Amino acid sequence: MTITKLAWRDLVPDTDSYQEIFAQPHLIDENDPLFSDTQPRLQFALEQLLHTRASSSFMLAKAPEESEYLNLIANAARTLQSDAGQLVGGHYEVSGHSIRLRHAVSADDNFATLTQVVAADWVEAEQLFGCLRQFNGDITLQPGLVHQANGGILIISLRTLLAQPLLWMRLKNIVNRERFDWVAFDESRPLPVSVPSMPLKLKVILVGERESLADFQEMEPELSEQAIYSEFEDTLQIVDAESVTQWCRWVTFTARHNHLPAPGADAWPILIREAARYTGEQETLPLSPQWILRQCKEVASLCDGDTFSGEQLNLMLQQREWREGFLAERMQDEILQEQILIETEGERIGQINALSVIEFPGHPRAFGEPSRISCVVHIGDGEFTDIERKAELGGNIHAKGMMIMQAFLMSELQLEQQIPFSASLTFEQSYSEVDGDSASMAELCALISALADVPVNQSIAITGSVDQFGRAQPVGGLNEKIEGFFAICQQRELTGKQGVIIPTANVRHLSLHSELVKAVEEGKFTIWAVDDVTDALPLLLNLVWDGEGQTTLMQTIQERIAQASQQEGRHRFPWPLRWLNWFIPN
């Protein structure tokens, strides 16, 4: 049996070990290899693309299709360009209705450019390919992004090309032929003059999320296979002091590059706790420029200097939580006003507090709340009824969790015949679809309570899924779940007996609010980690599942089954024979 009572230090990422790093000024030099250190795979892919014998002129990069990511990739590509600043392109000389092309001799020529990297997250046809304009008989030619990127690299988001397939077909043709032809965008309105085509050589980086890449692969299977591929790594694994330093330098670089304040020495621990909540891992921190910039932009209004303090960051996070917390508070009010029945004291047979995460479309913050699961057992033919599934409110994953839970119980009891009970399980006061298996351990405990006729401690909530062998498996949304139950207990007054049971594998995901951490430190709230559902049963039901020399839950259930089977056997006689029993002397 493995039951671990977590200390307050287990509830947040370890930052005490890195105080010396936080105290150091993280000065960033323009020549620092920050990008290659944090994005080695993407850096290597760029080197392959820029090689004189590159296998393809196209590169696919998996990354969010936002300007921050495109600019980071563009800056990295610029540092690798060996021919940066080389004059390429040409000059169109327009004389009446006659247009002639010559080689560029200076950067001032209309279609000349110095080899560069151009990035755009959204473009229209004229922006990408340029256009011919005619006004009062005068003709002018406007260069597009492909002309600006001539001899260099064009970085563009995939959603632009997927939404405008004709742009992609023309761009691919230009890259493959290494030549740009002037054509009318509207076939019904041809160009008024003939414009000579021009040599144009460029490499293209297509940036997209997983869905965009999948759509592009379906549209261009051969090119997708031949293109150089890499990914922007959104997280950094913290394995030692060097990786912490690396992350701190990346955050500082991102802030300074965007003219925003960077974290001060006492702000780093708070930022790391918030970062761990974002990634869902204590030892994984985000490299996402969008996430970093959001924190720095919001706290910038609270500070005047080049750095922000821990107090300022903490205040910003509290303000954000309050600003986004209306729905969570209303849901808590429903419980506190007993419109939703959740007990946090006492004992109940077949009732247990599970934990769930609520996400509303359009709302930026997920929040947790307890859910009451109830189980009713009666004499029957061994049927287990999932009311959510029967009412078509349960998803497939939820149904799978229910079947796994039943399989474990039947395997443990080792019955020679069908169990003489029927049971029904449900999420009480749940009127929307339920899916996922994160409540399967709670459901199993409620079922065992009902079968054994032993009450469950209502001051303890539980989350976690379970496999067919009873092992507790990790689930998501853990911080929100624990904080949701803690908020209800806190409003009703903490007794020191309340707490939450989680799978041991979930401990690494914890990054809880300071208020909850303080309550655990003071012994007012407890979090237990278990490896197996049988480890949770003594905490919830005050009886062990199995053992020698003591009353156990398995023994209690087997005795109830034996009693029910005997009663069922008596009632199997035909009614005339049961009537004759009255005349048989004892």
UniProtKB/Swiss-Prot annotation:
Entry annotation: catalytic residues: S438, K481
Domain of life: Bacteria
Annotated Pfam families: AAA_32, Lon_C
Lineage: Bacteria, Pseudomonadati, Pseudomonadota, Gammaproteobacteria, Enterobacterales
Domain Lon proteolytic: 346-543
EC number annotated for this UniProt entry: 3.4.21.-
PROSITE patterns documented for this protein: LON_PROTEOLYTIC (PS51786)
GO terms, molecular function: ATP binding; ATP-dependent peptidase activity; serine-type endopeptidase activity
Xref: SUPFAM superfamilies: Ribosomal protein S5 domain 2-like (SSF54211)
Protein's name in the database: Putative Lon protease homolog
Family, per entry: Belongs to the peptidase S16 family.
Recorded domain comment: Lacks the ATP-binding domain.
Keywords: Hydrolase, Protease, Serine protease
